[in-house]
Amino acid sequence: MAEHRSMDGRMEAATRGGSHLQAAAQTPPRPGPPSAPPPPPKEGHQEGLVELPASFRELLTFFCTNATIHGAIRLVCSRGNRLKTTSWGLLSLGALVALCWQLGLLFERHWHRPVLMAVSVHSERKLLPLVTLCDGNPRRPSPVLRHLELLDEFARENIDSLYNVNLSQGRAALSAPVPRHEPPFHLDREIRLQRLSHSGSRVRVGFRLCNSTGGDCFYRGYTSGVAAVQDWCHFHYVDILALLPAAWEDSHGSQDGHFVLSCSYDGLDCQARQFRTFHHPTYGSCYTVDGVWTAQRPGITHGVGLVLRVEQQPHLPLLSTLAGIRVMVHGRNHTPFLGHHSFSVRPGTEATISIREDEVHRLGSPYGHCTAGAEGVEVELLHNTSYTRQACLVSCFQQLMVETCSCGYYLHPLPAGAEYCSSARHPAWGHCFYRLYQDLETHRLPCTSRCPRPCRESAFKLSTGTSRWPSAKSAGWTLATLGEQGLPRQSHRQRSSLAKINIVYQELNYRSVEEAPVYSVPQLLSAMGSLCSLWFGASVLSLLELLELLLDASALTLVLGGRRLRRAWFSWPRASPASGASSIKPEASQMPTPAGGTSDDPEPSGPHLPRVMLPGVLAGVSAEESWAGPQPLETLDT
């Protein structure tokens, strides 16, 4: 019994000593019954604003267990079976690689900015487009008439020397009177037609152009002799026309009779104010039908009908070989470029031109290169009309011509302060012009990139049907009726001097062709969501879960890193060789120092634990890590 009581006394003393040590090392507990059971976790545990797991393993386990991404739970549910865990890990890794690969392909296509064409059909009343008609008879301007006759004689000499064709028979000598104010001109006879080389069985014919010093020569060759003669003659013809005064206008209405014999629209006669006239140096007298007519119904009876007079005047037989009418359909307020988009109608026929209109809507940057008007284009338009790409290309070429050759081409408008090219003022302009024109044909000039297509454009698709007109049975009275308006009386010439043209809408329906991006932002997000759902069954919320995992991992890395730094900092005095074994201090006011003093000493000496008060949570950590666990109890018992 005595031993039992002695043992009980020792245990009570040890208990009191342990309680005393705990009271010295920890904050005193809140007042309350010491024997009360701990409260339930839900009621007693107060959740913090942000809670982190204790390790990365716990973090990853929590994510795989609760994430909405398919396959993630398989990485932790079969932890006891390493084969399944490894297999599902490899499958998840392969799915991730496939997802990244397909997303890369998707983004690559998106950055190429592909577009698709959406075609829709609309039906509404449409204004008839403009129609330009030319008779194909270029005139000889009176101020340079004698120069043109010199050109005719020089052309006959060249053709005779090449093809042994005598064109001088039946022609009188120079008969044009010398005008009072004839501009000085010297025909350059060094630029003549010649055989350049033999290309197989074909003979190339052309002419040579040299620069002002004669050191650099350019050969303009053709496989067709007709094309060579026409281009050579056209070069000299434009060279002569450049001598005309800037204010000179050709009186192209001097022809006998009228070009337009009759005109009607929807059964009503046209008015004279509905025509605009001008003269083209190559295609002769031209008329533009400029009536504001709205097509009510399709068909010939509801379109424009024209009866035209066709004359074959021998003004420039080598320059113009056309026997008929030149026709071009173009948009309103657009310049007619007859050399690019026109076609011919032969005499003695009735041609029905059916128009079908398409509206094209193009996408601008970054999907394409188009412009809404002339404001955003680098090239200044020289034509006083709406923006078209052809007008921009012509203006760009003319400006480059002025910059490179110091003069402009006669068939195009001039920039401010420039003058037209002529051998009298610019002897080597032909060499410079054809060099530049060859670069334009081979797309080596910057005009193609400087002149984008319009973002909104109307394209006209034409279909033409022809028949003999007038017919054999109706020729008598038809020609007799029209003969009163200046046609020749000979019946064999009447048919070849007439042509009838009908301009109608094939249908009032028109197609609208609109460009749309293949991958707009909503479509790109939809494609990305489809791929994520295919490989992982993921959604936007699943991506937010991944983002949360990354944030938690970053925060846990910072916390664990800070804890390691604190441990290393507090363990540094223990690693000091002068510090002795750690002893337990029963009370904070009686803690001995290595020098034999107490904790009441103001400044303890020697390499021992410094007395540092840390704020916040770090103070508790430092106090907790400064004690040596259960070892003080054993020390007191001894």
From Swiss-Prot:
Highest rank taxon of the organism: Eukaryota
Catalysed reaction equations from the record: Na(+)(in) = Na(+)(out)
GO terms under cellular component: apical plasma membrane; plasma membrane; sodium channel complex
Extracellular side: 108-530
Biased composition (Basic and acidic residues): 1-13
Listed InterPro entries: ENaC (IPR001873), ENaC_chordates (IPR004724), ENaC_CS (IPR020903)
Membrane topology: Multi-pass membrane protein
Gene Ontology molecular function: any one: sodium channel activity
Gene3D superfamilies assigned: Acid-sensing ion channels like domains (2.60.470.10), YojJ-like (1.10.287.770)
Gene Ontology process terms (BP): sodium ion transmembrane transport
Keyword terms, alphabetized: Cell membrane, Glycoprotein, Ion channel, Ion transport, Membrane, Sodium, Sodium channel, Sodium transport, Transmembrane, Transmembrane helix, Transport
Record region (Disordered): 1-47, 574-613
Subcellular localization: Apical cell membrane
Transmembrane annotation, as ranges: 87-107, 531-551
Regulation: Originally identified and characterized by its inhibition by the diuretic drug amiloride.
Start-end of Pro residues biased regions: 28-41
Cytoplasmic domain ranges by topology: 1-86, 552-638
UniProt-annotated glycosylation sites, renumbered to this chain: N166, N384
PROSITE patterns named among the record's database cross-references: ASC
Other notes: The additional delta/SCNN1D subunit exists only in some organisms.
Complex formation: Can form an alternative heterotrimeric epithelial sodium channel (ENaC), composed of a delta (SCNN1D), beta (SCNN1B), and gamma (SCNN1G) subunit, where the delta (SCNN1D) subunit replaces the alpha (SCNN1A) subunit.
Entry's family note: Belongs to the amiloride-sensitive sodium channel (TC 1.A.6) family. SCNN1D subfamily.
Protein role: Potential alternative pore-forming subunit of the epithelial sodium channel (ENaC), capable of replacing the alpha/SCNN1A subunit, creating a more active channel with distinct properties. ENaC functions in epithelial tissues, where it facilitates the electrodiffusion of sodium ions from the extracellular fluid through the apical membrane of cells, with water following osmotically, regulating sodium balance and fluid homeostasis. This subunit could also function independently as a sodium channel or assemble into other tissue-specific heterotrimeric sodium channels.
Protein name according to UniProt: Epithelial sodium channel subunit delta
Native species: Pan troglodytes (Chimpanzee)
Lineage per the UniProt record: Eukaryota, Metazoa, Chordata, Craniata, Vertebrata
Gene from which the chain derives: SCNN1D
